[in-house]
């Protein structure tokens, strides 16, 4: 059992560490710009770091759910790879947003694509799980044919 989910567990732990890093950056920005809790407004430099962290936290549960469902029901390696891409693009998003609101956009779109791909993999995996064996085999043949033409 453990071997079947080791990649998913690793990506999950990396995601948790990334969330911790984002939180530490908010603490650092609070100190640098003298914004005491519970305030969430201050200089634009602080607000960008704060908003980047909050946005990443808001999407983290969606990421975890799609990562695990895609990994268990579709393919662990594919889900883990998409998960790593998602985490890397969220890190780039955070760094970009901390510098300027405009620099957040390209990584934001890239992370959205990775999340949509995880959702698609999770959906396909669950669909295949609930289909009868004959329909599942036909779906797999169709997917292989589509991948060859792509």
UniProtKB/Swiss-Prot annotation:
It is a multi-pass membrane protein. The active site is at 31 (proton donor), 104 (proton acceptor). It comes from the Eukaryota. Residues 28-48, 95-104 are lumenal. It is found in: Nucleus outer membrane; Endoplasmic reticulum membrane; Nucleus membrane. GO terms for molecular function: enzyme activator activity; glutathione peroxidase activity; glutathione transferase activity; leukotriene-C4 synthase activity. Keywords: Endoplasmic reticulum, Leukotriene biosynthesis, Lyase, Membrane, Nucleus, Phosphoprotein, Transferase, Transmembrane, Transmembrane helix. It comes from Cavia porcellus. Belongs to the MAPEG family. Its EC number is 4.4.1.20, 2.5.1.-. The modification Phosphoserine is found at residue 36. Homotrimer. Interacts with ALOX5AP and ALOX5. Catalyzes the conjugation of leukotriene A4 with reduced glutathione (GSH) to form leukotriene C4 with high specificity. Can also catalyze the transfer of a glutathionyl group from glutathione (GSH) to 13(S),14(S)-epoxy-docosahexaenoic acid to form maresin conjugate in tissue regeneration 1 (MCTR1), a bioactive lipid mediator that possess potent anti-inflammatory and proresolving actions. PANTHER family: LEUKOTRIENE C4 SYNTHASE (PTHR10250:SF4), MICROSOMAL GLUTATHIONE S-TRANSFERASE (PTHR10250). Pathway: Lipid metabolism; leukotriene C4 biosynthesis. The keyword Chaperone does not apply. Glutathione binds at residues 30, 51-55, 58-59, 93-97. This is Leukotriene C4 synthase. It catalyses: leukotriene C4 = leukotriene A4 + glutathione; (13S,14S)-epoxy-(4Z,7Z,9E,11E,16Z,19Z)-docosahexaenoate + glutathione = (13R)-S-glutathionyl-(14S)-hydroxy-(4Z,7Z,9E,11E,16Z,19Z)-docosahexaenoate. The chain crosses the membrane at residues 7-27, 49-69, 74-94, 105-124. GO terms for cellular component: endoplasmic reticulum membrane; nuclear membrane; nuclear outer membrane. Phosphorylation at Ser-36 by RPS6KB1 inhibits the leukotriene-C4 synthase activity. Inhibited by MK886. Residues 1-6, 70-73, 125-150 are cytoplasmic.
């Amino acid at each position: 059992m453990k071997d079947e989910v080791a990649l998913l567990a690793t990506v999950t732990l990396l995601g948790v560490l990334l969330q911790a890093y984002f939180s530490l950056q908010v603490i650092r920005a609070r100190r640098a710009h003298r914004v005491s809790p519970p305030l969430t407004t201050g200089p634009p430099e602080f607000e960008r770091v704060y908003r980047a962290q909050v946005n990443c936290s808001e999407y983290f549960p969606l990421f975890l759910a799609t990562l695990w469902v895609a990994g268990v029901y579709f393919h662990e390696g594919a889900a883990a790879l998409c998960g790593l891409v998602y985490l890397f693009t969220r890190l780039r998003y955070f760094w970009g947003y901390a510098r300027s609101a405009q620099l957040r956009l390209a990584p934001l779109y890239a992370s959205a694509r990775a999340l949509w791909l995880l959702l698609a993999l999770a959906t396909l995996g669950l669909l295949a799980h609930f289909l009868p064996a004959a329909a599942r085999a036909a779906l797999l043949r169709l997917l292989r044919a589509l991948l060859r033409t792509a």
